[in-house]
Design a protein with these regions (language model features):
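Extreme N-terminal starter segment of soluble prokaryotic enzymes
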Residues: 1-3
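Alpha-helical segments flanking ligand/cofactor-binding loops in enzyme cores
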Residues: 12, 115-116
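Structural motif
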Residues: 98, 116, 120-121
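Conserved catalytic-core motifs of GNAT/GCN5-like acyltransferases
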Residues: 104-106, 119, 124-141
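Short glycine/proline-centered loop/turn elements that form peptide/ligand docking sites
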Residues: 88, 111-114, 131-136
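Short amphipathic helical patch at the helix-1/turn junction of helix-turn-helix
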Residues: 74, 108-109
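Acetyl-CoA-dependent GNAT
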Residues: 5-9, 13-77, 81, 85-94, ...
Length: 154
């Protein structure tokens, strides 16, 4: 499996992944297309590719010393195979290379699988945002400081 920067040829696969994994929270085709095309200069789209098939994607923004992980989504049949870990490690490396000293993200409070994944990767809860999502769900805000070994869980 390879993690690489997304290209315009990946837009349809990313949009499909958004719909499959994020449902009502999925981003529009236009927004994905704009981001992949580089028209959002602080936003980085990554894809995980296996045998020429997109099996996951990640989106992160980088502004000054803060990176925000906006998305990690993995196709159902490729979960628990290290895809999310590989995408996260690439985001952490990208953030560190861009001068970030921390990574923030939000995750639904009822998403136990994601909360467990991020905790295992060194993220800690720093806040909660009530009614953050369109359906009124609360978001848990997580943070990970970047330092030496940031791409390997440290």
């Amino acid at each position: 499996m390879t993690v690489r920067a997304a290209t315009p040829a990946d837009v349809e696969a990313i949009v499909a992944s958004e719909a499959e994994n994020l449902g009502a929270d999925a981003w529009s085709h236009a927004l994905v297309e704009e981001g992949v095309a580089g028209r959002l200069p602080t936003v980085h789209y990554l894809v995980a590719e296996e045998r020429e098939q997109i099996v996951g994607h990640a989106v992160a923004s980088l502004v000054d010393d803060v990176a925000e992980l906006q998305r990690i989504a993995v196709a159902a049949e490729h979960r628990r195979a290290g895809v999310a870990t590989d995408l996260l490690n690439e985001v952490l490396a990208l953030a560190a290379a861009g001068g970030a000293d921390r990574v923030l993200l939000e995750v639904r409070e009822d998403n136990a699988e994601a909360l467990g994944f991020y905790a295992a990767e060194g993220f800690v809860e720093v806040d909660r945002r009530a009614r953050y999502y369109a359906d009124g769900s609360t978001a848990v805000v997580l943070r990970r400081s970047l330092g030496r070994g940031c791409g390997s869980g440290g």
